[in-house]
From Swiss-Prot:
PANTHER family: RNA METHYLASE-RELATED, TRNA (GUANINE(10)-N2)-METHYLTRANSFERASE HOMOLOG
Family, as annotated: Belongs to the class I-like SAM-binding methyltransferase superfamily. TRM11 methyltransferase family.
Keyword tRNA processing attributed: yes
Protein species of origin: Dictyostelium discoideum
CDD domains the record matches: AdoMet_MTases
Protein name: tRNA (guanine(10)-N(2))-methyltransferase TRMT11
């Protein structure tokens, strides 16, 4: 089985392996790698983190298929030599390959050499010096250098790469030449990752946009985690401006969205959620949107969706709401003639309830083997018991973490339906806490975590009391000043009257 080196993009380290495995499963590709390398690939510690991972697949076509979908893969290489010093590359190359093989390899082919580094930057002069160190190899005896090949010439064009891995923690010391790279690789590029779709679905190019529109890169990753492909039926129950179903339609799925807020789905008559589908030529994949409440969804208990992909509201930019009557309002029946256009009252919808209802919806409507992919808000105090659970769903991963601030972030949670839903057994009203999860979850009152300073409860209460006392003292002081001023004015008025009377008497 051939072995290849994957160079991942630098951000979203904790997403890399999970997206890779999901895409491999999507194409039914057997992919293997050293499990011990996961510590370095997924790490958020700059001292050990690296974007390079060796994988083994059955054929070159398999790795190329993976690259057509993965957005976190930058490039894939077939490595010919690997050392710690660039000067040793030639020795390594000549020890592994016969001289005659190297001489004949480039017959009737063109080539170009590139230099790429992780944790360092090279100027053009330094890159040329590095390339010159490889000039004595017989590999270049029969090939022809071509800097800008045409599309017709790409079939016989080889891109050779010199890759250096210094690591992030060494970045400030590299130019002093005080440290050696952790690794130096030399090989040819086999394929590029699917990074072009990020540009294609760039938020700034969309006519219909909102404050909660998901970043296109993370939307594409979410679709990959949901195993979306042509012919699938995909639902977003909190659709908003439709970022997830837009990229799901791009991959060939039939999509539908739901939301309780009609204004989120329809901005204007000529600018709405469907506008983005029209601009990308995807209207045939878009089935429409439904105005509904996810706490009482309109769907039957029927396995019909292949994937549910969503970003539920959690009260930071947009609060969650559901249909209900507020405590201070009485129930007033809607007249028969007004029911069609009636907009019902809404009340707050707690984040744990949002998550519990979402999993209930997935258990009822996903096919067995279908995936639920959603974003869960989290804090540094996250624990595994924060996760919502359901007997019909199996957790695939919840370790994909996007850190937004030092107080909170969000996790991409992926679950898979494993058994059919039975209302007499699996209805959430019949389940116990152990089945549903969310034991005192950190996302229960996320706004308090995000918008309050990190202080104890007693300190918060004390600060509130001090502020209240300060306001009361200010008002009391103001009232006293008003009384003194009024008394002073009355005294002056009386004195003026007495003076006027004295003058009259003298006259």
């Amino acid at each position: 089985m051939p072995k290849y080196l994957i160079n991942f993009v630098q951000q979203y380290a904790s997403f890399r392996i999970h997206e890779l495995e999901s895409v491999a499963r999507l194409f039914n590709i057997d992919i293997q790698y050293n499990k011990e390398d996961l510590e370095f690939i997924e790490s958020l510690d700059p001292e050990i983190e690296t974007p390079f991972l060796y994988v083994t697949v059955n054929s070159e076509e398999d790795i190329k298929k993976i690259c057509t979908r993965s957005v976190l893969i930058k490039s894939v290489y077939s490595i010919w030599a690997e050392t710690q010093l660039l000067d040793e590359i030639l020795n390594e190359l000549h020890s592994k390959f016969d001289k005659q093989f190297l001489s004949n390899y480039m017959i009737n082919k063109t080539f170009k050499i590139e230099v790429e580094s992780y944790g360092s930057k090279y100027n053009q002069k330094e890159k040329l010096e590095m390339m010159q160190k490889l000039k004595d190899s017989p590999l270049w005896d029969s090939g022809k250098c071509l800097m800008h090949p045409t599309e017709e010439q790409m079939d016989k064009h080889i891109l050779w790469y010199i890759l250096t891995d210094f690591g992030v923690e060494r970045q400030g010391l590299v130019k002093d030449f005080t440290l050696l790279p952790r690794k130096v690789y030399f090989g040819q590029r086999i394929a590029k990752g699917n990074r072009d779709d990020i540009i294609k679905y760039n938020l700034s190019d969309r006519k219909y946009l909102g404050t909660t529109s998901m970043d296109p890169e993370l939307s594409l990753v979410s679709a990959n985690m949901g195993l979306v492909k042509k012919g699938h039926f995909v639902l977003d129950p909190f659709v908003g401006t439709g970022s997830f179903i837009l990229v799901a339609s791009h991959f060939g799925a039939q999509t539908v969205g739901c939301d309780i807020d009609i204004k989120a789905m329809r901005k204007e008559e000529d600018c709405n959620l469907e506008t983005n589908f029209k601009d990308h030529g995807l209207t045939s994949q878009f089935l429409g949107t439904i105005l509904c409440d996810n706490s009482c969804p309109p769907w039957r208990v029927n396995s019909m969706f292949d994937s549910i992909i969503t970003d539920p509201p959690y009260g930071i930019r947009a609060g969650a709401r559901k249909i209900g009557f507020k405590e201070n309002r009485k129930f007033v029946p809607v007249p028969e003639g007004l029911r069609r256009d009636h907009i019902p009252q809404c009340i707050d919808y707690s984040v744990p309830d949002v998550m519990a209802d979402l999993l209930e919806l997935a258990a009822k409507t996903l096919i067995v083997g279908g995936r639920l992919v959603y974003w869960l808000p989290t804090t540094p105090d996250y624990k595994e018991t924060d996760l919502p659970r359901h007997p019909c769903l199996r957790l695939i991963t919840a370790s994909c973490l996007q850190i937004l601030t030092n107080r909170w972030g969000r996790r991409l949670v992926t679950m898979e339906k494993i058994i059919e839903y039975n209302d007499s057994i699996h209805n959430k009203s019949l389940l116990v806490q152990e089945d549903l999860g969310q034991f005192d979850p950190q996302h229960k009152d996320l706004r308090a975590v995000v918008f309050w300073k990190k202080m104890g409860t007693n300190e918060k209460t004390k600060k509130k009391e001090q502020k209240k006392k300060s306001v009361e003292n200010h008002l009391k002081s103001k009232n006293n000043n008003d009384v003194i001023n009024n008394n002073s004015n009355d005294t002056n008025s009386n004195n003026n009257c007495n003076n006027e009377n004295n003058i009259e008497n003298q006259k």
